């Protein structure tokens, strides 16, 4: 079956936002107006088409990015729904990898919120072209112009309005379209499906003229001919202006800003028009790079004629189909029944069922093309971030980097049957979400779950109980401490056991020193003249690595350390890789003690938004949690407090804050860095763990 839509007519985009800015509602309306969804699902009632996990429906937050296909104005839209809660930033990063453009949704009442900054920065990191939609214009306190100022102040970006609101709060009727210089006015009867194009209201004429000028001036900067014509008094026509706005979006020169209210069905169609007009097709963004099986860089263009390559970006467990792997096809054509290679894991797979996903129903397809986002059922080996490709033209597309978890809990199944269910469930959850890790505590034998925050783990536990019916006891959350040496030391150690039979002999001298934070572990052999034969060096490395997982302060992983092997001795008969491993292990442990190892604790960046009346209590409380206040700011009529607080002092903070502010204050936190723990904290932790 030939390709039905030319690749330049594809728009692979996501909707990114702060929690509660109305992202899911906006996606819902897009599906409604593109004719895919017959009944509008309201998040308030927990029935949105995109939010299809029970946990999401209850919490009213989007957790898993479901990919959906819809059509508008002859263009094919692949919409990737991204979560907006900070504990799920990994999902946002992952979906930003596979989309070409994004709509950033702001709550017009709140402006730019903490999580907006986070997802915006991730968008910057992956150079995602964006347009901005100021949602909730019907809310009390909605302020479109403050949103524009916020984008400059808080995101450091350049916004250019393409629309101005007509009326505000409950009188919000529509918007002035600055490209066409017309007013779009909605009548409330037709669920937003109908709007009238009329002349700009007289009271907005001056403002419209002022902002139209700003738009045209920003646009003509991108083209010398247009600039010359403009200076001669000729304004660009509509087609030229749109072309220039598109160029601005693709280059990041400025960000077009639109407004509306998705909940009240106003402004969604012009937003769709803007997606089609300004966001990139797969041909407008740089081709993806990867490495071939010889390690050379290769480029894969969005072209059906190129060898097939696709990236798995999301894995889900579906009760009807089994494991579903969401993939973006970067090049070539994929047919069901073909054999592919998972080049990341060097495993072969066969493509079984191929599905095109609508938020919660699916359509079987036989063939998919470059630019498509498809769901593959029944892949055995694929994990998030893996590349699947043509066996004759192997490539590994860019690797995704996943952050280390900062919080952990122990989980104990209540019965033997639960134990079995838990094993299966955890394997699936870990495959679906690389920022969620599972390990076993060597000493206690307990299963440890590790994640990015309390909410992250709460939801995983909830899924275990509901979806997989595992009955288990959950321990209190623990902080993921780390250890590091603070001074450079040189240390020698000799291991010998030479009493009858085969003996063991190895001597090593190590230099152990702290490296820059975030550098991790580095090893270097500086052996000259064969003091330690080459074949024993892996034994030395193994010895070091066995200590790294459990340091000398309280048994936590050792980070940011550089180890050099500078000297050693060996015996022709009694030396072995094992002897060198044992010697190095002892030498490294003693060096860590000599090098004054300290305990590091994760420090979280916390932002609290609170009504003025509670500011004093909030700051006092943060100080009592060893928080360092970084600054305060006003946002609307609320006070914004930024602080750095140790994670170990933030457990249960949500309930505390709620009771302190009568439920009116909110907070977000995310991992920022590791810092040395004070002596009293270190002593307490050592008593508990060492």
From Swiss-Prot:
It comes from the Bacteria. The keyword Isomerase does not apply. Catalyzes the GTP-dependent ribosomal translocation step during translation elongation. During this step, the ribosome changes from the pre-translocational (PRE) to the post-translocational (POST) state as the newly formed A-site-bound peptidyl-tRNA and P-site-bound deacylated tRNA move to the P and E sites, respectively. Catalyzes the coordinated movement of the two tRNA molecules, the mRNA and conformational changes in the ribosome. Residues 8-283 form the tr-type G domain. The gene is fusA. The keyword Cytoplasm applies. GO terms for cellular component: cytoplasm. NCBIfam families: EF-G (TIGR00484), PRK12740.1-3 (NF009379), PRK12740.1-5 (NF009381), small_GTP (TIGR00231). Belongs to the TRAFAC class translation factor GTPase superfamily. Classic translation factor GTPase family. EF-G/EF-2 subfamily. InterPro entries: EFG_II, EFG_III, EFG_III/V, EFG_IV, EFG_V, EFG_V-like, EFTu-like_2, G_TR_CS. It is found in: Cytoplasm. Keywords: Cytoplasm, Elongation factor, GTP-binding, Nucleotide-binding, Protein biosynthesis. GTP binds at residues 17-24, 81-85, 135-138. Transmembrane segments: none annotated. This is Elongation factor G. PANTHER family: RIBOSOME-RELEASING FACTOR 2, MITOCHONDRIAL, TRANSLATION ELONGATION FACTOR G-RELATED. GO terms for biological process: ribosome disassembly. GO terms for molecular function: GTP binding; GTPase activity; guanosine tetraphosphate binding; translation elongation factor activity. It holds the Pfam family GTP_EFTU_D2. Its main location: cytoplasm.
């Amino acid at each position: 079956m030939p390709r039905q839509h030319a690749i330049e007519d594809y728009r692979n985009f996501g909707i990114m936002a702060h929690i509660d800015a109305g992202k899911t509602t906006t996606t819902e309306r897009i599906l409604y107006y593109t004719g895919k969804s017959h009944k509008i699902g309201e998040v308030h009632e927990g029935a949105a088409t995109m939010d299809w996990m029970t946990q999401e429906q209850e919490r009213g937050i989007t957790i898993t990015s479901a990919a959906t296909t819809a059509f508008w104005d002859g263009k094919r839209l692949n919409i990737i729904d991204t979560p907006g809660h900070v504990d799920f930033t990994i999902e946002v990063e992952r979906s930003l990898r596979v989309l070409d453009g994004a709509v950033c949704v702001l709550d017009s009442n709140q402006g730019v919120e903490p999580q907006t900054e986070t997802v915006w920065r991730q968008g910057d990191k992956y150079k995602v072209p964006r347009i901005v939609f100021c949602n909730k214009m019907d809310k009390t306190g909605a302020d479109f112009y403050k949103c524009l100022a916020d984008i400059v102040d808080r995101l450091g970006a350049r916004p250019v309005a393409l629309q101005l609101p007509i009326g505000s709060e409950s009188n919000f009727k529509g918007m002035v379209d600055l490209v066409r210089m017309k007013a779009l006015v909605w009548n409330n009867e037709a669920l937003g499906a109908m709007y009238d194009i009329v002349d700009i209201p007289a009271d907005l004429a001056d403002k419209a003229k002022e902002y139209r000028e700003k738009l045209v001036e920003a646009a003509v900067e991108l083209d010398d001919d247009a600039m010359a014509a403009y200076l001669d008094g000729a304004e660009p026509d509509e087609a030229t202006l749109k072309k220039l706005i598109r160029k601005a979006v693709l280059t990041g020169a400025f960000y077009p800003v639109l407004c509306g209210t998705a909940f009240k069905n106003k402004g969604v169609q012009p937003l769709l028009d803007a997606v089609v007009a300004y966001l990139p097709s797969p041909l407008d963004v740089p081709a993806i790079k990867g490495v071939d099986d010889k390690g050379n860089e290769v480029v894969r263009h969005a072209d059906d004629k190129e060898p097939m390559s696709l990236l798995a970006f999301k894995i889900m467990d579906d009760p009807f189909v089994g494991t579903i792997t969401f993939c973006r096809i970067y090049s070539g054509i994929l047919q069901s029944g073909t054999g592919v290679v998972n080049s990341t894991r060097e495993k072969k797979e066969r493509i079984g069922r191929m599905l095109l996903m609508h938020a919660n129903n699916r359509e079987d397809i036989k063939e998919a093309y470059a630019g498509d986002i498809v769901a593959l059922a029944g892949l055995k080996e694929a994990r998030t971030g893996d590349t699947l490709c043509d066996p004759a033209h192997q490539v590994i597309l860019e690797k995704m980097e996943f952050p280390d978890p900062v919080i952990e809990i122990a989980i104990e199944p209540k019965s033997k049957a639960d134990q079995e269910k838990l094993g299966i469930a955890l394997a699936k959850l870990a495959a679906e979400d690389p920022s969620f890790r599972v390990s076993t505590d060597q000493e206690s034998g307990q299963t440890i779950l590790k994640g990015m925050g309390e909410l992250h783990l709460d939801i995983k536990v909830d899924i275990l109980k509901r979806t997989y019916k595992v009955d288990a006891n959950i321990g209190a959350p623990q902080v993921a401490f780390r250890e590091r040496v603070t001074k450079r030391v040189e240390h020698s150690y000799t291991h010998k056991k030479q009493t009858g039979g085969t003996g063991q002999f190895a001597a090593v001298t190590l230099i152990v020193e702290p490296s820059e934070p975030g550098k991790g572990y580095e090893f270097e052999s500086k052996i000259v003249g064969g003091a330690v034969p080459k074949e024993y060096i892996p034994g030395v490395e193994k010895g070091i690595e066995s200590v790294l997982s459990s340091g000398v302060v309280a048994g936590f992983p050792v980070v940011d350390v550089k180890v050099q092997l500078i000297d050693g001795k060996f015996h022709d008969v009694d030396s072995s890789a094992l002897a060198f491993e044992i010697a190095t292990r002892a030498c490294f442990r003693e060096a860590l003690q000599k090098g004054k190892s300290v305990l590091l604790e994760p420090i979280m960046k916390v932002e609290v938004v609170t009504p003025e009346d509670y500011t004093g209590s909030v700051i006092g409380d943060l100080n009592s949690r060893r928080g360092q206040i970084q600054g305060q700011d006003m946002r609307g009529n609320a006070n914004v407090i930024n602080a750095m607080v140790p994670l170990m002092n933030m457990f249960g903070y949500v309930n505390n804050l709620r009771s302190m502010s009568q439920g009116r204050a909110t907070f977000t936190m995310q991992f920022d860095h590791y810092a040395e723990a004070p002596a009293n904290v270190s002593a307490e932790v050592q008593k508990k763990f060492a």
